[in-house]
């Protein structure tokens, strides 16, 4: 099913969220005018408002993941470089910030998000004409990249969040990439690679869990999630068009995330096998907050199609990630 064009605003004039999946983008993610039954008090919103800005970069040699996260009462950020040939993370940092001081999250996917804590810095911004820039600096790690323009529509998904209120996300498929990633004395060109981004903004439950998969080339890509957001953000980009997908099923071994995964949707439009090359994992327990997270990096093979009667498109060794994540935030 091809998706309709995105509305101008996430909320109607009466404050009702425009739940659904759309092709395109909006200029603001603002929940202050939410009407009942989705509206909550300002104090509740302060502690349940979660936002993140994530960028993935993929080349035959490297996979890089970068994110800035604001959970309302604090913020954090991470960056890593994964060497696909050595099958290991060769540089990374993860840094908790100071509330209200170290992170600034964009109000939409076309805005600028920044994190700065001592020598660790991340900047994600749109520099005009649908072009984006990423800069990362940290101990032994540096990324300077530009990517875009978007060759296929952005996904806009808005829906209820289990245990919370409303949530929305804006995601790209593969974008042309150029730049450089460096660690220590080693430098890698990113030219000719593929970038993608995820801007998410919502009022979520204190206990939130999800499984996620994402991979992109310049002519094919997908995003899948099972958990707090249901099938709202499940989408396929193919031949310049954006299609909605059904509920996603993740068959894997949680105790052995580097074993093969099988992922498929219940509408018969996607069936993929994921072969991990390595993973980034964190397990934090700060008493008032906790996060258990594993993000395998690897390749997807199988098939996708735009409709039940369309021919299957073969997917072979498409670089991307899966994720098993549970947060108390």
What are these regions (language model features)?
Residues 1-329:
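Structured soluble/peripheral alpha/beta segments that form catalytic or ligand/cofactor-binding pockets
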């Amino acid at each position: 099913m091809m998706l309709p064009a995105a509305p101008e605003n996430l909320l109607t004039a009466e404050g009702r969220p425009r739940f659904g999946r759309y092709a395109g983008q909006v200029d603001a993610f603002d929940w202050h005018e939410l009407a009942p039954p989705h509206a909550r008090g300002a104090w509740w919103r302060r502690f349940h408002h979660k936002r993140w800005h994530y960028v993935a970069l993929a080349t035959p040699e490297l996979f890089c993941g970068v994110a800035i996260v604001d959970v309302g009462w604090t913020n954090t950020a991470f960056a890593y470089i994964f060497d696909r040939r050595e099958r290991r993370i060769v540089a990374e940092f993860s840094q908790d910030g100071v509330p209200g001081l170290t992170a600034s999250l964009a109000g939409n996917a076309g805005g600028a998000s920044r994190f700065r804590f001592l020598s660790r810095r991340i900047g994600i911004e749109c520099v005009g004409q649908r072009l984006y820039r990423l800069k990362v600096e940290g101990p032994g790690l540096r990324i300077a990249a530009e990517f875009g323009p978007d060759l296929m529509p952005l996904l806009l998904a808005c829906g209820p969040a289990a245990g919370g209120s409303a949530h929305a996300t804006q995601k790209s498929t593969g974008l042309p990439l150029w730049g450089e990633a460096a660690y220590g004395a080693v430098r890698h060109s990113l030219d000719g690679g593929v970038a993608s981004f995820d801007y998410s903004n919502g009022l979520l439950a204190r206990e939130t869990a999800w499984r996620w998969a994402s991979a992109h080339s310049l002519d094919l890509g997908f995003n899948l999630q099972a958990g707090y957001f249901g099938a709202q953000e499940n989408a396929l980009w193919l031949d310049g068009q954006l299609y909605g997908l059904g509920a996603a099923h993740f068959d894997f071994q949680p105790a052995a995330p580097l074993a093969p995964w099988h992922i498929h949707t219940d509408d018969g439009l996607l069936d993929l096998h994921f072969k991990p090359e390595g993973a980034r994992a964190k397990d934090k327990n700060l008493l008032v907050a906790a996060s258990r997270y594993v993000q395998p990096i690897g390749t997807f093979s199988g098939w996708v199609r735009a409709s039940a009667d369309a021919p299957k498109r073969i997917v072979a060794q498409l670089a991307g990630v899966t994720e098993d994540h549970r947060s108390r935030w």
